[in-house]
């Protein structure tokens, strides 16, 4: 266990301090700030609801259920149960903190869990967007370490939670779709 903690802290300090540049000190807080994603998220919802037909509306429904579950379980159940303290609370005097400290608990990262869930669900329905979504998910995860509010294993744990819940939600969707198609109901079918 001590070896994992050492690896986690070493990676944290490498990303948070060794990789620190003026450009990244401006870019990473921008990437990590949820408010900066409001317009793209509203645009995504609009596109899925209005412009993408039935497939888009189904994607949006699966996405809302998935992220709702992922966010709740990660923030309300796993974080308090694990009880890992953020680097911004634990070692504040040793880090390059570029945003506010955030809540007390760090594992798993909700940013990482939610963006991974979004990536998996949208990639399932629209595979052509997978590369850009993976890149954005990775950037958001790295930004959380860079700004000083998460350890690398918090991000990896968040990615795992998001991935598991996304595939669980997709699996339930596929089961529902197959059941409805067997019953002759075509509301689940899209092109």
Question: Where in the sequence are the language-model features?
Answer:
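Helix-loop junctions at the membrane-solvent interface of multi-pass transporters
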Residues: 51, 81, 173-176
């Amino acid at each position: 266990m001590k070896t994992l903690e050492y690896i986690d802290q070493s990676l944290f300090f490498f990303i948070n301090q060794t990789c620190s540049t003026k450009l990244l000190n401006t870019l990473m807080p921008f990437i990590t700030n949820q408010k900066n994603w409001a317009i793209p998220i509203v645009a995504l919802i609009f596109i899925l609801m209005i412009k993408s037909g039935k497939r888009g509306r189904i994607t949006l429904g699966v996405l809302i259920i998935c992220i709702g579950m992922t966010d709740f379980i990660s923030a309300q159940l796993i974080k308090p149960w694990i009880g890992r303290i953020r680097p911004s609370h634990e070692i504040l005097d040793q880090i390059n903190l570029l945003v506010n400290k955030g809540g007390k608990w760090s594992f798993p990262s909700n940013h990482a869990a939610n963006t991974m869930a979004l990536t998996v669900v949208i990639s399932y329905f629209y595979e052509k967007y997978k590369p850009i979504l993976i890149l954005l998910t990775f950037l958001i995860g790295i930004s959380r370490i860079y700004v000083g509010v998460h350890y690398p294993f918090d991000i990896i744990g968040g990615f795992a939670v998001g991935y598991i819940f996304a595939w669980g939600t997709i699996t339930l969707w596929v089961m529902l779709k197959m059941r409805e198609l067997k019953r002759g109901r075509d509301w689940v079918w899209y092109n």
